[in-house]
A protein has these predicted regions:
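Intrinsically disordered, low-complexity Ser/Thr/Pro/Gly-rich regulatory segments
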Residues: 1-224, 228
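Conserved P-loop NTPase-based nucleic-acid remodeling module centered on helicase motor cores
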Residues: 68-71, 77-111, 130-132, 143, ...
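Arginine/glycine-rich "motif VI" loop of SF2 helicases in the C-terminal RecA-like domain
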Residues: 108-109, 115-130, 277, 306, ...
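Alpha-helical nucleic-acid-binding subdomain
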Residues: 219-236, 240-258, 265-476, 480-498, ...
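Core RecA-like ATPase module of SF1/SF2 helicases and allied nucleic-acid translocases
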Residues: 442-485, 492, 498-507, 521-522, ...
Length: 734
């Protein structure tokens, strides 16, 4: 039998490590299931899986749930009861002594759980009456001979049972199939049916796309056709994402993921799952980009509805799960303002706090940590966009730790009274999307040198029970592969004549973000080939569109660039069938002053030619937020119906569109050695779900670098030079 979590394949899911009197018995059955199904393809196995019984409005948890392409759904209810604790049996009721419950009806309980899952499958015509349903009761502390001697096997209502010796046998799968009670007959599933079953078990099934009222095209323009195909595309279930989204770690957890890998969706799922599983917990889901608020609320609500079979919806006013911007203000609470207000904190400022928003926040967090003893108010905190809360300046850190993270840590209750240094802080990040700093929220930066050993050191990569301490997400679902590789190449400077500015310098870390590497990083000047397999960029747009997905144009003047922009957007709306809002996004590149000026000029150009624009945080379309009173602004808003959003990069983070227009490339190219400016370009390129149109004014050396990055596609070869700026990477435990 395989004895370690590392030895098992990723098909096994521990929802939460649990510690109770019967745990050893459940663990024994779970270990036997994992050993038996370890080499079996097309199956998923869960240790505890909440099932909501809608008509009774209660939630049950099958101790072990097996979902198999050939065998269907199997529910195993484990009872750690000994033979002398069962006094007599009447029907399916077991009357007990010295046990926590009497009578016991394990079979009925497990059948109810299975019926709910089978009914969910039967709601879909593709699966109706096709998924086999089986149920068993496992008694790991009772042998078959003990059961027989008591006369229980002669009962007419004796349920199908896995006895102690069955669990220890090598042919457990055969025993389960022969023993289990069949609740619904069925058949082995076809590939399409199996994919749908996985979606039903692991996440919301996407509803069919309904054409909206408005302009209709007959036939559909090519780009509109592509979008509709992409909307109907449902990729195969990502086993790693199920692990991340449906597990509750007993201690800190770090999630490193490339742009478009689904970090935000997964953190919303994880927060909703934790809230559903532990409704008494105080949980905070924290993010940096304020325009993500509505998206986060929507995603959390959708996941809660899924977990509760549409019985529970998210109510920000009453829920113990709080969705918080990192800052917060008088109109909407954030992480800092919530801690500030609940602790009666009053900081006296001798002078105005200086710096950009992350620096100001870190400064205030450090002062709070230095001057106050923080009382814990949360049971779990999940942080998205973690790279934006990590700062370079030592004076903004608290001791050797990032101040914002350490304030969050102090606001957490210990997982258990006897482990005061064990707390549930979960953070996700992509170092390539950092816009203001080069620091990376590694475990050492977040927790300090001593506590960071929780995620490393002698403890290994797994917590007890089989939940990983850290993840690296390598699949990009949003951005097409060639756009992503071009974004990484230009963002890190792979093709710079002087050598890359920033990047990863070992094969293992490249593999963790989905690349294959040929070459030796230890040899300066040696050729390195980096390629990205299609399997790690599953967006299928290249199957539907034969033209360029990423185009780059240079114009003689800003006026020419903006005229080309409005012509392309006019084409997108009136000929390509794209909706102004959410299908199209304009992102302005450059420093704060440059991007503000160019944003205004671009918006005015669109309006002049009859295209409504929307500037994020404005009240209405065709308005500029800086001309509005504070109370009239909508800081959470990023889109406006029937208007094209024109955004600077800081507001655009976390958002996406099918057609992304990037303007102001020259603002990056004239200062091409700036890592933060190149990161702007990376973030902007990876907002796309299909196409990018990139443009700038005037020729710069970086223009040829951009053209070459586009030309190279998914494979790049360059002579390695040690990065001039920073080295990206942190040990990802295996």
């Amino acid at each position: 039998m395989v004895s370690t979590a590392q030895g098992y394949k990723c098909k096994f899911f521990t929802v939460e490590p649990i510690f109770f009197n019967g745990q050893r018995a459940e663990q024994k059955v779970w270990d036997a299931v994992r050993s038996a199904f370890n080499d079996r393809e097309n199956c998923l196995c869960f240790w505890t899986y909440p099932v909501f019984i809608k008509d009774k409005k209660i939630c049950f948890e099958p101790d072990i749930l097996i979902v198999d392409k050939e065998l269907g759904i199997i529910v195993i209810e484990v009872k750690n009861i000994r033979i002398n604790q069962i006094t007599h049996i009447e029907g399916y009721n077991w009357f007990t002594q010295n046990f926590f419950k009497s009578p016991l009806n394990a079979y009925k309980q497990s059948k109810n759980q299975l019926h709910q899952l089978i009914n969910s499958c039967n709601n879909y015509p593709l699966l109706k009456q096709k998924v086999k349903g089986r149920v068993l009761v496992a008694l790991p502390s009772i042998t078959e001979s003990q059961w027989t001697r008591k006369g229980f096997s002669e009962q007419l209502c004796c349920p199908p049972i896995l006895f102690q010796e069955d669990i220890d046998r090598d042919n457990l799968i055969q025993t389960i199939v022969q023993t289990a009670g069949q609740v619904q007959p069925g058949k082995p599933l076809e590939d399409k049916e199996w994919r749908l079953l996985q979606k039903i078990i692991c996440g919301p099934v996407l509803p069919p796309i309904i054409n909206e009222e408005g302009k209709t095209f007959n036939p559909l323009p090519p780009r509109r056709q592509v979008i509709e195909k992409l909307q109907q595309w449902v990729g195969s279930t990502d086993i790693e994402q199920i692990h991340i989204g449906m597990s509750i770690p007993p201690e800190p957890q770090r999630i490193r993921g490339i742009a478009g890998s689904g970090k935000t969706v997964l953190l919303c799922q994880k927060a909703a799952w934790m809230h559903w599983y532990h409704p008494d917990w105080d949980i905070a889901l924290v993010f940096f980009t304020r325009s993500l608020y509505d998206q986060a609320v929507h995603l959390v609500n959708e996941w809660l509805k899924f977990f509760s079979n549409d019985e529970v919806e998210y109510d920000p006013e009453t829920s113990k799960l709080k969705i918080l911007h990192a800052w917060g203000d008088d109109r909407q609470p954030g992480l800092y303002s919530t801690i500030h207000d609940t602790q009666n904190i009053s900081l006296i400022h001798d002078q105005r706090v200086k710096g950009n928003p992350p620096e100001k926040l870190a400064y205030l967090c450090k002062r709070v940590l230095s001057e106050y003893q923080i009382q814990p108010i949360f049971d779990a905190i999940l942080i998205d966009e973690g790279q934006d809360l990590a700062l370079d300046e030592q004076q903004l850190k608290f001791e050797d730790k990032q101040s914002v993270y350490w304030l969050a840590w102090q606001a957490l209750r210990p997982v258990a009274p006897d482990t005061p240094d064990v707390r549930r802080l979960i953070w996700a990040y992509d170092e390539a999307q950092s816009l203001d700093a080069l620091s990376i929220p590694t475990s050492k930066e977040v927790l300090g040198a001593e506590l960071s050993q929780i995620l490393g050191g002698n403890g290994g990569a797994w917590y007890e029970g089989g939940i990983r301490k850290a993840y690296a997400m390598r699949h990009c679902y949003r951005t097409p592969g060639n756009i992503l590789t071009a974004a990484h190449a230009i963002g890190m400077g792979w093709l710079r004549p002087e050598g890359m500015l920033t990047g990863i310098t070992n094969k293992k870390d490249w593999e963790h973000i989905g690349y294959e590497v040929d070459g030796d990083f230890r040899k300066i000047g040696e050729p390195i080939t980096i390629s990205r397999p299609l399997k790690n960029s599953p967006n299928p747009v290249h199957h539907f569109w034969s033209g360029d997905l990423l185009e780059f144009n240079v114009y003689d003047s800003c006026e020419a660039e903006l005229n080309a922009l409005r012509e392309k957007i006019h084409q997108n709306i009136h000929c390509d069938g794209l909706k102004p809002s959410r299908d199209i996004l304009v992102i302005v590149l450059g420093s704060q002053e440059e991007s503000i000026n160019l944003q205004k000029r671009a918006a005015q150009t669109l309006q002049k030619y009859g295209v409504d624009f929307y500037i994020p945080s404005a009240l209405n379309s065709n308005q500029f937020p800086e001309q509005m009173d504070l109370q009239d602004k909508r800081p959470n808003q990023f889109w406006k119906e029937e208007a094209v959003t024109v955004s600077r990069i800081y507001r655009a983070k976390g958002n996406e569109a099918y057609m992304v227009h990037l303007i102001g490339f020259n603002n990056i190219a004239k200062n091409e050695s700036s890592i933060s400016l190149r990161n702007q370009l990376f973030v902007a390129l990876t907002r796309s779900k299909a196409w990018v149109s990139l443009s700038g004014v005037g020729e710069y050396p970086m223009c040829e670098e951009m053209r070459q990055a586009i030309k190279n596609g998914n494979t790049f070869t360059f002579n390695y030079k040690k990065p001039l700026g920073r080295v990206i990477g942190e040990e990802i435990l295996t």
